[in-house]
Amino acid sequence: MVDITDDASPAQIKQAIGSAAAHYMQTSIRPNDMVGISSWSSTIRAMVDNLHPLNIKTSGVIQLLGGVGPNGNVQATLLTQSLANILNCPAYLLPAQSIERSTEDRARLISSGEVADVVNKFAEVDLALVGIGVLEPSQLLKIPATITTKRC
């Protein structure tokens, strides 16, 4: 639970939630935990920004969602790697887009070596960090070149 003032801005609310989530994670995570992370959440970004380096080593941080658009993969990589650095562990990056054009494209992608290696690690996740958010798109999805209006 996060206590905020009635006149708190959305940025202040996100900061408060990120700070509380960081505190919870710092007190809950165990050595050798495998952490999965959603890459589209600005609140999770706030949590990572509020974490302090821990004196434990986890098994790894796995990117659970691919990026959307060219900048989406960069953001997902940075968030996953930042958390892995704080947790003193390797980052397992998902080299894929989250949205594919067809189920055939998805099947081809899932069976490719690098993607399959990461997807196979999903079963090892002990703690998954996912943003639930609001109905409107995340600011991370609104970055230019992330979403296009062109129909396929």
Where are these regions (language model features)?
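Detector for methionine-enriched segments
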Residues: 1, 25, 34-37, 47
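Ligand-binding beta-strand-loop-alpha-helix segment within the catalytic cores
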Residues: 2-31, 55-144, 148-150
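Gly/Ser/Thr-rich loops at beta-strand to alpha-helix junctions
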Residues: 36-46, 68-69, 134-136
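Distinct, well-ordered alpha-helical segments
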Residues: 49-53
